[in-house]
Amino acid sequence: MTIDATLDTSGASGADHGAHGDASHEEFHVQAVASHAPGNALAGEGYVAGIDLGGTKVLAAIFSPDGTIVSRAKVVTGRIGGIDVVDRMAAAVSEAAKVAGLNLSQVAAVGTGVPAPVNPVTGVVHMTPNIAGWENMPLKQELGRRLGGIPVAIDNDVRVAVIAEHGAGAGVGIRNMVGIWPGTGVGGGLILDGRIYTGSSSYAGEIGHITIKEGGAPCGCGGRGHLEAYCSRTAIVKQLEKLVRDGKKTRLTRIVGRDLLRAKSSDLAEAAALGDAVVMSVLDRTARYLAIGIASIANLLNPEMVVLGGGVVEALGDDFVENVAKRVRVQPFSATTVPLKIVASALGDDAGITGAAIIARQMQVGLHP
């Protein structure tokens, strides 16, 4: 296991640091980068850590009392799964604290997003397709134990990213906001009356599984016609693969080879930038279905803003967001759709660690389990 650690101050030396804890024999790479601007939602008592847990990497960051990121540490998630991933999360926090010049005991709270359904109250991850051996993982308890009893807050990763955008990104000052994150799937989160809405059993915001076409394309959950079956990267590349099988030609085969299911969001963006008509038509179809979903949500909740984030949106950029917004504005019942602001995520890759730090702050004052 190798951890890359970064000091977010101009005083970083650039020298390698040895790890401590479970990563005592690992290599660390330290360099100076610009600090994150302070934000009120990130400010609080003492230092906190935010963890962005993904299927391929674990990123941890330390936030100062004024909300500035002072250090980061990154480690691969690995293929072992189970408790090994929890060890890696703890090691990343420990190293980020060390690089910041802190003892682990000086970290007051830790927050983490998890790419899976999770109960924030019990702290149990029920299952995750990206991490083996995490069925009913008591993450809150296990991570806290490995960090010497530091309080831990956990939540779904997209919900955490939406919290970040509301507290320190595109949605600052917005009372009612929806976040939609198209990526491998389509995740979402709801901010109602200034607070994240979790529902009766903590699963509110599963926007990817609203039905937009009865009996439509199969979804990974087993249903049909869900938003995720039309607007995720997985759905986009499946549609492109079908068109190629039917005889359509696309530059994407030159970029990724004949196995189009390997295409990343950046590959789709590259093909679109080259004017690939097949890719552009599928992305236009994606924007159309996403607009249908957004209009339905707008009619139900009447939010002020929809923030679009995730790998697909980050790769395709403002043109895609504007295409979606244009299609939303022409949907029926214009009272909810025309005034709706539709914007891209402002925090990008930092949304995960930022939202995780915010839920740690909220836990400190009793606003998050």
Model feature map: region roles:
Residues M1-A109, V118-V124, L143-P151, A164-I174, ...:
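ATP-binding/phosphotransfer module of carbohydrate and carboxylate kinases, centering on a glycine-rich
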Residues A73-V75, P129, S200:
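Short hydrophobic alpha-helix segments
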Residues V76-G78, G133-W134, A204-E206:
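A short acidic/small-residue loop/turn micro-motif
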Residues V124-E135:
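A charged helix-plus-loop insertion that forms the helical arch/lid used to bind
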Residues D52, G111-P115, D155, V178-G185, ...:
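Short beta-strand segments
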Residues K57, V160, T184-G187, E214:
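Conserved A3 ("GATE") glycine/threonine-rich loop of ANL adenylate-forming enzymes
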Residues I154-I163:
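A glycine-rich, Thr/Ser-enriched phosphate-binding loop motif common to dinucleotide/cofactor-binding enzymes
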Residues L190-E206:
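Short, charged low-complexity linear segments at domain edges
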